[in-house]
Amino acid sequence: MGLWIDATAGVAGDMLLGALIDAGAELEKIQQVVEAVIPGDVLLRAEEVVRQGQRGIKLHVEAQHEHHHHRHLSTIKELLVNADIPEQTKQDALGVFELIAIAEGKVHGIDPEKIHFHEVGAWDSIADIVGVCEAIRQLNPGLIAASPIALGFGRIKAAHGDIPVPVPAVAELVKGWPTQTGALMESTEPVGELATPTGVALIRHFATQDGPFPGGIINEVGIGAGTKDTAGRPNVVRAVLFSTSGKAASNPDTRTLVQLEANVDDQDPRLWTGVIESLLVAGAVDAWLTPILMKKGRPAHTVSALVDSSAVEAVKTALFASTTTFGIRSWEVEREGLDRRFEQVEVDGHTINIKIGSRNGHDISAQPEFEDIRSAAVALGISEREVVARIPQGTTE
């Protein structure tokens, strides 16, 4: 299954989340994940609205009490790392915040780790980012593509005063991605800001292909509505779930990625765990370490990462910063995976998600999600091995 995001009328985090919920992601589970990151802070509420004749879902992120809207990247990372949420959701959210921090750091000329988030550090933006990451984990598309992004034009008031559209952080985030002004037909009036840093960062983190709808069999169309009902065009984002035909349909999870590698023989071995984590946070799809023997019999390691093209520079920066290497090799690879879906089983009142992999319509593999196993083990006061043993027979065969 593929996902195409239509951002030709702009994109914001809450609009994209509304579209994904309309396409089939479960709001209740998303609320649980957001609650685990920022407990008691926000309530998510989906409302069906109409924008210039187009129905859609307006996702409301409602504060439960007063909040401090300014947070450093380190604080947000701590919230995510300590949260008991699916690992994929956690790593994707960390990656999105890292992209925004890198863009903001470049704009303000400071280290991304020292970035003091304003609007993006607010509770609603954290909920948007975590919510979208969880929604995409639930829908589990093998391919994610997106249209050119409508940016808008004119000037807006922000935390740093009156600034032009696109705002500086958005201008950094869209580098290398097709854009358009989003001007209304038969009008030259400024339309203001159509794309927010949160919305753009989510597309840049997830989408590996740009352009119009890739074609295929459309299964679901989710519509996410913005707050304003502006004249002349529906203020919406579309999330289109589709199946491809022919060879790709038998296994849609085939992606072209970039593999980065470096040989390192003088790294403190205690630092390797942090190296792998930094690569994943920077946007790597996967990262690993391989022991090797170099010339003159020197023991060393090869550190490797699989990366979407949009995250190559960020991951290279993280690799240089976290290791002693002076060079990185890179080349394109094609990764083929199984078509995936999730089913649920109960173990002593605790839900365990089972990831099932299939190819050409035949189930090949079924494995329980480890985060669910760990949560159940803690709640029941038993070992993770015992939880696995209690899963109904045949579920993981």
Swiss-Prot record:
InterPro entries: Ni_insertion
One GO BP annotation of this record: protein maturation
Span of the signal peptide: none
UniProt entry keywords in alphabetical sequence: Lyase, Nickel
Catalyzed reactions per annotation: Ni(II)-pyridinium-3,5-bisthiocarboxylate mononucleotide = pyridinium-3,5-bisthiocarboxylate mononucleotide + Ni(2+)
Keyword check for Lyase: yes
Molecular function as annotated in GO: lyase activity; nickel cation binding
Pfam families: Ni_insertion
Domain of life: Bacteria
Enzyme Commission identifier(s): 4.99.1.12
Enzyme class: lyase
Family listed: Belongs to the LarC family.
Protein role: Involved in the biosynthesis of a nickel-pincer cofactor ((SCS)Ni(II) pincer complex). Binds Ni(2+), and functions in nickel delivery to pyridinium-3,5-bisthiocarboxylic acid mononucleotide (P2TMN), to form the mature cofactor. Is thus probably required for the activation of nickel-pincer cofactor-dependent enzymes.
Protein name as catalogued: Pyridinium-3,5-bisthiocarboxylic acid mononucleotide nickel insertion protein
